[in-house]
Amino acid sequence: MRTLIFATPSSGSTDFKSNLCKRNEYDLNFGEILNERTFKKKLSRNIIDNEEWKIFCEENSALNYTEQLAQFQIKRFTESKNCIAKLFPDHLHLLNIDLILKYCSKLCEVADKIFYLQRENKKEQIVSRSVRFIEGEPDKELMYSYKGDLSNDILNENFEHYRKYLNIIEKVFKNHPGQVVTLERDIEDTTAEGRYVYKGDWELPEELPILK
C-alpha cells in the first residue's frame, strides 16, 4: 500500500508518521518526499541510486531542478507497492501554484491511502513555524530554546505562507479526498513541556481553511 501524509509544518506529522511506521512494515520510507535538502543527503549516502537520478535528469534536462526532483520522486513512489511518504507542498515553493497543484495531485492520484493532517489552532501553528524559522533554516529545537519575541511582521509573513499552502491542500482535497486527521483531537501531544509560548497580542488577519 502506498501511504501519503499530506500536511503543512507543525501539524503533528512527525509523531503521526512514526506511529504508522511502528504499526506497519513499509518497504520504503520516503520521509519528506519533496524535500530537496534531505533528497540530497540521501543521494550523498547512496540511499537513492545516483546513477538512476543522473540518467533521469539527462532524459528530462528541459525541466528545472525542482520539477526533476518532483517527477523522479513521483516515479519512485508509483513504482513502490508498499511505502510511506510525507508531502509538504511548500517544498515546491519555487514553482508557480498551478505546478504545485499538479505535482501534489499526481502523488495523491497514485496513493492508496491519503491522510490529510491539520491543526485547528492556526495561531499556534503560525507561531510554531515563526519560531522554527527565526534564524532562516528550520530548527525544531528553537521551540524550546528561543526566549525572544515575535514581531507582527514575522507572524504576518508566516500567516501568508500558511494561507497559500492551506488553500492548495484544500483544492487538492476536493479532487482527492482522504482521511482528515486533526492534531488536537487525533494525535497525542508529546512535545508540550517547555515549548515556546507566545505572549503577544497578534491575531489571525482572517480565518484559514479547515478540512471536514
Stretches found by the model and what they are:
Residues 87-180, 184-195:
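PAPS-dependent sulfotransferase catalytic domain
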Residues 2-4, 81-84, 178-179:
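Residue-level preference for the first positions of well-ordered beta-strands
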Residues 1-72, 196, 202:
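PAPS-dependent sulfotransferase catalytic core
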Residues 75-76:
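Conserved alpha-helical scaffold flanking the Walker A/P-loop in AAA+ ATPase domains
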Residues 79-82, 110-112:
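A general structural motif
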Residues 191-212:
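C-terminal accessory extensions appended to soluble enzyme cores
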